[in-house]
Every structure is written in C-alpha cells, then in structure tokens.
Design a protein with these regions (language model features):
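Acidic, Gly/Ser/Thr-rich repeat motifs that build Ca2+-stabilized beta-propeller blades
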Residues: 1-86, 134-137, 141-149
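Beta-propeller domain segments
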Residues: 4-6, 72-76, 81-177
Length: 177
C-alpha cells in the first residue's frame, strides 16, 4: 500500500501481463499497476499500469515482483530473470534479473544510475539478480532483498544504485540437474 494510503487509498500490485497478440508478440511479463481501493473496500478503481517488463517472454517462472516504496516516494520493483533468460541479468538493454526504480506515475527519476548510459533502460537501478523473493526498506532507508538462488545459493543483499549482484556469473548455489 502507498505510504499515504489513509488519505489516497492507493495500492500497488504486480501481475503477469500477456503480450498484445495484435502486434504479433507472444509471451508475458511482470507488470506493476496502481489503483485506488474503493471506499467500501470491495473494488479497485482507476487502475493504471505503471511499468511492464521488456522484453516479454513465454515462461511461467521467475517473475520476481517485490515492491518497496522508497523514502523519496519512488518505487523499487524486483524483477526475476524469467529462468531461461539468465544471461539477460548481466545486460542493460532488458529488464530480466533487475531492480528498477520509477516514480508513482511510471516515469523515470533523473538520478537513476543508467539514465545517461547509451543503450541502457533508464529505469534500471541494479543488475545481476536471479529471482527476488523478498524486499524491505531497512531502518536506515536502504533497500534489502532476498534472492532465491539455485540449490543452496539464496542471498540477502543490501542494494546500491548501479551495482551488479553477479547472477549468473557469480553464485554460491549449484545448477539443478
């Protein structure tokens, strides 16, 4: 829920968004939306999609989707690598295996670390993540995440802007199989 929920009744949620078949695309992505909870608490109103992970990919795995409101009012969103696209976590031209930071209207803050990096998606905050399962803001305002690793490779990390957290190049787990 939004930090000002008592007055604005805004909630944030993620869902699996299908590709628009009219464009010939396929697959799905993690999408982040905001909505206002009705006064009777029974419906969501004014639903607005703030973000949709790119590229879409046909998979039912590693969506991520942990939302944390930053003290400055921006939103952090943890995104999984979609399992079969693990190498994407090391690049800046897609959202797989990333944490992104956006404003509550979906726009990109100008102080994000990759805003001025050619070829990078400007909403990216950090890279090299597998599948973020938990996220919380610490007492000092920092972002902490729990990442589901392969066979014994779970991690807890304090997230910093522009940092690479290693997946899949560095892991303490073992591949399945």
């Amino acid at each position: 829920v939004d930090s000002k929920f008592a007055t604005n009744r805004t909630v944030y949620f993620c869902y699996s968004k299908a590709a628009n078949d009219k464009t010939g695309g396929s697959g799905n992505s993690t999408a982040l939306a905001s909505a206002r909870l009705s006064d009777d608490g029974k419906t969501l109103e004014d639903v607005n999609v703030l973000f949709s992970q790119q590229p879409k990919y046909r998979s039912a795995l590693h969506f991520g989707c942990r939302i944390v409101e930053n003290p400055d009012g921006t939103l952090f969103l943890g995104l999984g690598d979609r399992s079969h696209r693990m190498q994407d976590a090391q690049t800046l031209h897609n959202h797989h295996g990333k944490i992104v930071r956006i404003r509550k209207d979906g726009s990109v803050p100008p102080d994000n670390p990759y805003v001025k990096t050619q070829g990078a998606l400007p909403e990216i905050w950090s890279i090299g993540h597998r599948n973020i399962q938990g996220a919380v803001r610490g007492n000092n305002g920092g972002l902490w995440i729990h990442e589901h690793g392969p066979q014994g490779g779970d991690e807890i990390n304090r997230i910093e802007p522009g940092k690479n957290y290693g997946w899949p190049v560095i892991t303490y787990g073992e591949q399945y199989g």
